[in-house]
């Protein structure tokens, strides 16, 4: 009988801890996260580029998405267009201006659930010194252990269109399109799960 009385008391005491811990913090993994973008090139084709997500935190509550959040930093100097001269031009003052503002940052204001796997992050993007509202539709791909069980990972995908002129990138209007299609692939490691060099993909090691 004593145990019957003690058990409810213990459960009552620890319940707030579980409730508080429902929102899990994940550290963005720069090895497996990236931003890919493309823009029209003089009507002939769409040119593709890539940027590195250097750091950030995703907080995600699978039971209440409204408690979730994201804060991510993108290295503008990391832009890769597949050509050294083109990289230099895109980093220049008329476009990304990475010498003056080396990073872009996205910070959420709220997260809205739309379906079992899809939602929208309402937030703001700071780029080239301008901070503007930006909503990111996203999909939760998977949350779980890596195949080797090294850590727990949350994976997300998002696509959005940016108006480059809104951020002051108004040059080359006749040759470069204004609307930039952006594709984000994010993997984030649960807080407390350490990432080691062995976690990273190498030519001799499979993806984890």
Q: What positions do the PLM features span?
A:
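Bacterial N-terminal signal peptides
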Residues: 8-16
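Low-complexity, acidic/polar, glycine-enriched regions of mature
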Residues: 20-208
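Bacterial N-terminal signal peptides that target proteins for export
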Residues: 1-8
